Design a protein with these regions (language model features):
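Active-site mouth loops of central-metabolism enzymes
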Residues: 84-95, 146-158, 182-187
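Beta/alpha (TIM)-barrel catalytic core signal, keyed to glycine-rich beta->alpha loops juxtaposed to Asp/Glu
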Residues: 4, 36, 40, 63-65, ...
Length: 372
């Protein structure tokens, strides 16, 4: 029987498992800055609950978990980690993407994040084909983003309607569980965008709405409009990780808590740096993404990796597990969005569902990364 809790969760990772060294490609014709490429337990705390006195090591299991965490005030029950799919149809072809989706489902995952701009819609197409082949659409919670596809640029009413209908066709489904505004389109009145979504919700094509890359003031404006009968945001996607904290932890965190928004951090592994795969500049391939990773090769980056190495040694987990577990322990965080470049990397990612950091470990990690 499926259990619903608010947020939380534990798993063992084999040290021989392939390390996650790539969170997502950083350049390319269809690049979008989201998604990241890189046994339910009843005693899970509510959002923002205190961490345990001692870190809780994961238990070995490959069985599909029945535990789901309820998103804010929605009826959606999701796994603790959302699968980012920005590389589907780009650096991951149909065979590898299918393997990733299958392994994610096998490990208990049910929350898939995509966008109509990922690989010019090929990501959505691969996901839709896989769900139809596996006959698992009703198991999955599907989130897709609109607003950045060149064919449906922006968040005007007509563009939103066309974009959603196109996504529904590619995904081979009759509804989108979470529709996300990929950008804050300041050229269009927010009231127009929300009204367009309202019509789609009434038609049964969209269930819930999320915002991505929205400022605190725009979230407040949206809430005022929602108070007058327009759809409200239930989720917020934002850049947040151990190495990128200030942007979210200032105003956005306060607004998210006040509005009851479920937060989905992206770039959770800092382009793979927090997975421990990059310890020197010699390990970085020259690229835009390489420049982003190289920015963390400093005292602060070395400090956080040192703390993570110690925790990893104490509990036989990979660094990626720790980075995601840290996010999941933060107030309002629902499901970090994490992508992988192979199915083998998912074990470390999903192990974060079954691993909780202690208060002392959380404090040590917070101190190591305090200066943003």
């Amino acid at each position: 029987m499926t259990q619903f809790v608010r947020v939380g969760a534990r798993k063992r990772v084999d040290e021989s498992q392939e390390p996650i060294v790539a969170e997502i490609p950083a350049v390319g014709p269809e690049y979008s800055p989201h998604s990241g490429a890189i046994s339910g337990l009843p005693d899970i705390p509510e959002l923002g609950a205190p961490a345990p006195e001692e870190s809780m090591a994961p238990s070995p299991s490959n069985a599909r978990s029945a535990e789901r965490h309820q998103i804010a005030d929605t009826e959606l029950g999701v796994s603790s980690v959302a699968l980012g799919t920005s590389v589907f149809g780009w650096t991951l072809g149909i065979e590898m993407a299918t393997e990733v989706l299958g392994r994610y489902r096998e490990l208990g995952g049910n929350f898939i994040d995509t966008a109509d701009s990922y690989a010019s819609g090929r990501s959505e197409h691969l996901i839709g084909s896989w769900m139809r082949e596996e006959r698992c659409r009703d198991e999955m919670v599907l989130s897709t983003k609109i607003g950045r596809n060149p064919d449906f640029q922006g968040l005007g009413a007509a563009g939103i309607e066309r974009a959603v209908n196109a996504s529904l066709r590619r995904l081979r489904t009759d509804r989108i569980d979470v529709l996300t505004f990929h950008v804050d389109d300041r050229d269009v009145e927010l009231e127009e965008s929300l009204s367009a979504v309202d019509a789609l919700m009434r038609a049964g094509k969209v269930r819930y709405l999320a915002a991505s890359n929205f400022s605190a003031d725009r979230l407040l404006e949206a809430r005022v409009l929602a108070a007058n009968g327009l759809p409200r945001f239930s989720l917020l996607q934002t850049h947040y990780s151990l190495l990128h904290r200030a942007e979210y932890e200032s105003e956005l965190a306060l607004v998210a808590r006040a509005q009851g928004l479920a937060v989905m951090p992206y770039f959770a592994l800092a382009n793979g740096f927090l997975a421990g795969g990059y310890r020197s500049r010699a390990s970085i391939v020259p690229s835009t993404r390489g420049l982003r990773i190289g920015a963390h090769l400093n005292r602060r980056g070395a400090r956080v990796l040192s703390v993570m190495d110690r925790i990893a040694g104490d509990f036989n987990v990979q660094l990626a597990t720790i980075a995601i577990a840290w996010l999941r322990a933060k107030s309002s965080v629902c499901a970090p969005v994490v992508g992988v470049s192979s199915a083998a990397q998912l074990d470390a990612v999903m192990a974060a569902s079954d691993f909780r950091l202690s208060r002392s470990d959380m404090i040590e990690l917070d101190r190591a990364t305090a200066a943003n």
